[in-house]
Swiss-Prot record:
Ranges where the CUE domain occurs: 304-346
Record-stated family: Belongs to the AUP1 family.
Listed PROSITE patterns: CUE (PS51140)
Cytoplasmic side: 1-19, 41-423
UniProt keyword terms in alphabetical order: Endoplasmic reticulum, Lipid droplet, Membrane
InterPro entries named among the record's database cross-references: AUP1_CUE, CUE
Location of this chain's protein in the cell: Endoplasmic reticulum membrane; Lipid droplet
Protein name: Lipid droplet-regulating VLDL assembly factor AUP1
Organism the protein comes from: Danio rerio (Zebrafish)
Length: 423
């Protein structure tokens, strides 16, 4: 998974970074709050009207006009390309309301794959599948039987299974939506709005709705692509990749292999690294950072990392706990972390030397027993300065090997390990 690529596919920050746009947003904020309250009142009436009127072209026209008052403007290109005989539409996913927007243009049903069922599912415009659908195979079979019925509305599915910002790339299309029907019609969706991002990860649909009412408008561009059918001998995944490439070309973005699971893992990693970065900036006292890190540990994984960090801290007391923890999150091994930190021992020693008080009396008082014990075993400096770069490099390598051997011996003695077992 490419971190750089996945960072560009999602807007993790709602507000803009541009100071001028942020200033305009602050000036607009009082108007936006008043507009949001007014649109909440109007939105209730839009919901009641959509529930009272039967599904028809008249209802879609009236609701579409009322949604324009709510700030949802829908535009479509080449409406004649929409095939009325198509049983399955596939579309890229940008916001929580993509299915509602497509439903303003043509009647279709979108099954609810995740979330609460019941009234809330119906009110949001989803189709409830029932309690019997558990696995992906059962879901595919249920939707396949639904598409085979002649009196049902077309299905609208999102093969990405999660939202993106729609500006950089598409998530990898899942193959199961393309096993529902061999004939599909791709729909390209592009969403734009001023001031703020159209969607952010981990944001609920209710929060997104309030932000939609807050901004002046949100424009949805819908583009209908010609229908496609799966060729003989073509697998469902190959068919999904072909449709993904066509939609990416239409939107001017790239097709990626990043999945919904990769997005969830990246969000989890960012959530985990955020408090760690905050604790690393609190101060220069390692013990305070360690207590702060242990205080925020709520899972077994954090407790294990903290325990490993304490073991490394006992071997290398001069290294800050924040540095040890950051390296352990990457290596997940005490020995590897000790080796990596020993490579940077000169950096820590130079920082300690800069903070050491001047004067012979203070210097003697600030010396630690560990430094006194390690001084005969370690080789902090070469006996003579090498005349050639090779000699100087060998001198540095010898000091590193001595430091590593001392740290290894101290670790074995601390935990009562045998050298044969450790090797």
């Amino acid at each position: 998974m490419e971190t750089r690529g996945i960072e560009q596919m999602f807007d993790f920050q709602r507000l803009p970074n541009d100071r001028f746009i942020l200033l305009l947003l602050l000036l607009y904020a009082p108007v936006g709050f008043c507009l949001m309250l007014l649109r909440i009142f109007i939105g209730v009436h839009v919901f009641l009207v959509s529930c009272a009127l039967p599904d028809s072209i008249v209802r879609r026209f009236i609701v579409r006009i009322m949604c324009s008052v709510l700030g949802l403007h829908v535009q479509q290109n080449s409406p004649r390309l929409r095939d009325k005989t198509t049983r399955l539409y596939v579309c890229n996913h940008v916001t929580h309301f993509d299915h509602n927007i497509i439903n303003l243009l043509t009647s279709c049903n979108t099954p609810l794959l995740e979330g609460p069922v019941g009234f809330l599912c119906w009110a949001r415009g989803f189709m409830e599948l029932g309690q019997g659908v558990g696995s992906r195979t059962e879901l595919t079979e249920t939707l396949h039987r639904y598409c085979s019925s002649p009196d049902t509305l077309p299905l609208l599915l999102f093969p990405e299974e999660d939202t993106t910002n729609g500006r950089t790339g598409l998530l990898k299309f899942s193959s199961w939506p393309f096993s529902v029907s061999d004939s599909i019609q791709p729909v390209a969706l592009l969403v734009k709005r001023p001031f703020i991002a159209v969607s952010t990860p981990e944001s609920s649909w209710l929060t997104e709705l309030l932000w939609t009412f807050f901004v002046p408008f949100t424009v949805y561009h819908v583009r209908w692509l010609p229908p496609l059918s799966k060729e003989d001998g073509e697998t469902h995944q190959e068919f999904a990749s072909k449709v993904q490439g066509l939609l990416a070309t239409e939107l001017g973005v790239i097709s990626t292999q990043i999945t919904k699971a990769d997005k969830a893992e990246h969000i989890k990693r960012k959530r985990h690294s955020a408090p760690q970065t905050a604790h690393s900036n609190l101060g220069a006292r390692p013990r305070t950072v360690a207590q702060g890190f242990l205080g925020t540990s709520v899972g077994a994984e954090d407790s294990r990392i903290a325990r490993l960090a304490q073991q490394v801290k006992e071997v290398l007391p001069d290294v800050p706990v924040s540095v040890i923890t950051r390296d352990l999150l990457q290596t997940n091994c005490v020995d590897t972390t000790i080796t990596n930190l020993l490579e940077r021992t000169d950096q820590f020693n130079s920082e300690a030397a800069m903070t050491m008080p001047s004067g012979p009396g203070k210097a003697a008082a600030s010396s630690t027993p560990s430094a006194m014990v390690s001084s005969p075993n370690l080789k902090p400096a070469a006996k003579s300065f090498g005349r050639s770069p090779i000699d100087r490099h060998m001198s540095l390598q010898e000091r590193k090997e001595a430091l590593y051997e001392y740290a290894r011996r101290r670790y074995i003695e601390k935990h009562g390990l045998n050298k044969e077992d450790d090797l």
